[in-house]
């Protein structure tokens, strides 16, 4: 029973994160509209509030294209896996309600963010294009260099908080 409740809590957390991202993109579009002295997205519904959901429907109904010589399965699985990894990062965030309580939350965060590097590399490799592979390898090198500095800063904060 406790497992089912934690699973429901996790699903609610992920749904809330995805809905908040949708409305933050709506806010971004509205602010950009006001900055450029034009109205933002206001054609759908009341003040454009259903606009993110209409955008999601539009994206899911678009025609799926893929490179002719690509590895089809890994080409489509790698972005999905990257999305799931970014959603798993939210599981280690501390909340008032104990969703998942484990002592190594910082290490879990670093592991999930570092696994996201492999999805970029697999996406570049599976397209069977030299340019996409080079772009993927450049993104991997850049992400790894940023993760090293992020881990060092995090460990420094942890070390100084214990003193």
Swiss-Prot record:
One of its GO terms (biological process) is aerobic respiration. It is an enzyme of class 7 (translocase). It catalyses: a ubiquinone + NADH + 5 H(+)(in) = a ubiquinol + NAD(+) + 4 H(+)(out). InterPro entries: NADH_UbQ_OxRdtase_su1/FPO, NADH_UbQ_OxRdtase_su1_CS. GO terms for cellular component: mitochondrial inner membrane. It is found in: Mitochondrion inner membrane. The chain crosses the membrane at residues 3-23, 77-97, 104-124, 143-163. PROSITE patterns: COMPLEX1_ND1_1. It holds the Pfam family NADHdh. It comes from the Eukaryota. Belongs to the complex I subunit 1 family. Core subunit of the mitochondrial membrane respiratory chain NADH dehydrogenase (Complex I) that is believed to belong to the minimal assembly required for catalysis. Complex I functions in the transfer of electrons from NADH to the respiratory chain. The immediate electron acceptor for the enzyme is believed to be ubiquinone. This is NADH-ubiquinone oxidoreductase chain 1. The gene is mt:ND1.
């Amino acid at each position: 029973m406790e497992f089912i409740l934690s699973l429901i809590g996790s699903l609610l957390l992920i749904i809330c994160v995805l809905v908040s991202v949708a409305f933050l993109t709506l806010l971004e579009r509205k602010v950009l509209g006001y900055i450029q002295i034009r109205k933002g997205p206001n054609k759908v519904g009341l003040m454009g509030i259903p606009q993110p959901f209409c955008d999601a429907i539009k994206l899911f109904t678009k025609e799926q294209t893929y490179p002719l010589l690509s590895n089809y399965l890994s080409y489509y699985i790698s972005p999905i896996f990257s999305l799931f990894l970014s959603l798993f990062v939210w599981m280690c965030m501390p909340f008032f309600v104990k969703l998942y309580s484990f002592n190594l939350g910082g290490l879990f965060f670093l592991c999930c963010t570092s696994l996201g590097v492999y999805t970029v590399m697999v996406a570049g490799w599976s397209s069977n294009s030299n340019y996409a592979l080079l772009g993927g390898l450049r993104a991997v090198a850049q992400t790894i260099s940023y993760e090293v500095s992020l881990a060092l800063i995090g460990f420094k904060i942890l070390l100084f908080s214990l003193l």
